[in-house]
């Protein structure tokens, strides 16, 4: 019977031998018919260990992540440095410009305990230069020991435009070329620079009453002045100019803004209306004004 099956099994045995020879050469060196039972059992229980894939260590991933963040940070900074300087500003952007360039101080320029030495009076709108001088004379008569210093913001702006060494020269030049309005706070910043210069000269050693012409013309400028420079002693309203000259020289929007300044200071008891213009002031009226200023 075995002799009959041998021819049939011979192809299968040869095929098995090839597979075993390929996969387990050490186990098929001896023909299957000549192997001992121990060799056959050993062949069936051979365990092949597959190579394990090495998984990345967590700390290496962490290092790579940190390195990526650092690279992004430096690239972003280099891009920001290449951005051209911006010269047209909103109010918030102008505040940032002041902080970046060191033009903005954290505290008021005139501290509270210096308010008696330096006093500030503002006239939101004056058309007649002669009337401005009359108000200056009233202030001088009120306090003969103090000097009166008239500040004209329009004149300061022109000085900034003419001198390339001034801090706001290029900003003002750019805004004028583009036909854009001055951002809120710019005029106050120019006034602040002028007052700072005065305080650091011999003139600043004396008691001084500052009279600021045609300023503030918006409530934002008024608030910024009191936040950055000093308290305003009195807002002087020239009744005749406000009633007759203002409509001739300002738009409706500008007129409303200037009148709102009067309302702002009236709400805190700092507004005074001067009603005399052409008629000579008698002694009684002058005394009333001096008591109230």
Curated annotation (Swiss-Prot):
Superkingdom of origin: Eukaryota
Keywords recorded for this protein, A-Z: Membrane, Mitochondrion, Transit peptide, Transmembrane, Transmembrane helix
Transmembrane residue ranges: 57-76
Listed Gene3D superfamilies: P-loop containing nucleotide triphosphate hydrolases (3.40.50.300)
Any GO CC annotation of this UniProt entry: mitochondrial membrane
Membrane topology category: Single-pass membrane protein
Location in or out of the cell: Mitochondrion membrane
Presequence boundaries: 1-27
Family listed: Belongs to the AIM36 family.
UniProt protein name: Altered inheritance of mitochondria protein 36, mitochondrial
Lineage of the organism: Eukaryota, Fungi, Dikarya, Ascomycota, Saccharomycotina
């Amino acid at each position: 019977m075995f002799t009959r099956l041998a021819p049939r099994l011979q192809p299968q045995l040869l095929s098995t031998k090839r597979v075993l020879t390929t996969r387990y050469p050490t186990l098929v060196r001896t023909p299957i018919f000549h192997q001992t039972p121990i060799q056959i059992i050993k062949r069936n229980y051979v365990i092949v260990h597959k190579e394990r894939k090495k998984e990345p260590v967590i700390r290496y991933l962490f290092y790579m992540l940190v390195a990526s963040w650092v690279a992004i940070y430096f690239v972003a900074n280099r891009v920001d440095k290449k951005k051209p300087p911006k010269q047209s500003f909103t109010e918030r952007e102008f505040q940032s410009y002041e902080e970046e360039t060191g033009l903005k101080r954290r505290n008021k320029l005139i501290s509270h305990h210096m308010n008696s030495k330096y006093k500030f009076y503002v006239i939101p709108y004056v058309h007649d230069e002669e009337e401005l001088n009359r108000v200056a004379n009233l202030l001088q008569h009120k306090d003969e020991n103090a000097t009166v210093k008239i500040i004209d913001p329009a004149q300061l702006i022109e000085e900034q435009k003419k001198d390339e060494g001034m801090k706001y020269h290029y900003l003002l030049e750019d805004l004028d070329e583009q036909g854009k309005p001055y951002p809120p706070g710019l005029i106050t910043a120019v006034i602040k620079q002028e007052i700072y210069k005065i305080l650091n000269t011999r003139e600043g050693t004396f008691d001084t009453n500052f009279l600021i012409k045609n300023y503030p013309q918006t409530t934002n400028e008024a608030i910024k002045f009191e936040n950055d420079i000093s308290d305003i002693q009195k807002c002087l309203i020239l009744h005749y100019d406000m009633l007759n000259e203002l409509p001739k020289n300002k738009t409706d929007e500008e007129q409303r803004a200037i009148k709102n300044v009067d309302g702002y200071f009236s709400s805190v008891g700092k507004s005074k209306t001067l009603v005399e213009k052409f008629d000579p002031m008698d002694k009684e009226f002058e005394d009333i004004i001096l008591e109230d200023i």
